[in-house]
Amino acid sequence: MYFMTTILVIHAKPLTERKAYMEELLKDFTGKVDYILDADRDELTDEMLAEFFKPGCEVDKKSNAASCAIKHLLACRYIVEHDLEGALILEDDIELHDRFFEKFERSMQEYRQRYSHLPILISYEDSSLQFVPRSQRVKGQWLYESPLNRVRFTGAYYLNRAAAEAIWKDVQENKCDISVDHYQVKLYREGKIQILWCEPPLATQGSFTGRFSSSIGRIRKFEAIRWKLKYAYKRLLYWLR
């Protein structure tokens, strides 16, 4: 019924409650689901950091942020090595909005008609509170070009093979020197990939809503409440623009 892309889940093995959550979340999905398990924080080595990061950069240390970045880069390699058309990449705290796969399929129909010949990353999440202004939205359209100076995080995105190849090639030649979401936008600015936003967004990281504690930095309960209030404000603000 739906576009049967592979789903790759970015997962840290010690977070067993998140694995159980993702299995329940995706239990009705009939396509292939695989987990990116390598490069947990306690598995990082100096050699591994040197393979992916520029020496001395902000992520060149044995941290949760470095682990997360490497897992996303390994997802790119997975797409390339398995010769996939692309994959939907989800972090293990993601909350999918109502009728996610139905709406995802509609966005993919538009992707196939307009963008499949390009190296494409499609962001599906709203965790960064970045939206398409209402004045720019077109009825029946799901995908919009991302501004060059905005970051939508990496909780839920589709990456086609051409974009995965471009990212993996750049890592091999130039190394990553910033957090993975900013690295993706850096490659977008350089013209190596193109980033699209799905509007309306279809997913939110549970680390922001309070469902989970963040695996990178602690988000306290009051911060989750503040995020939800800010979310309502931002949705209204972008609707008025």
Write out the residue ranges for each language-model feature.
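An acidic/histidine-cluster motif and surrounding catalytic segment
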Residues: Y2-L90, I94-R241
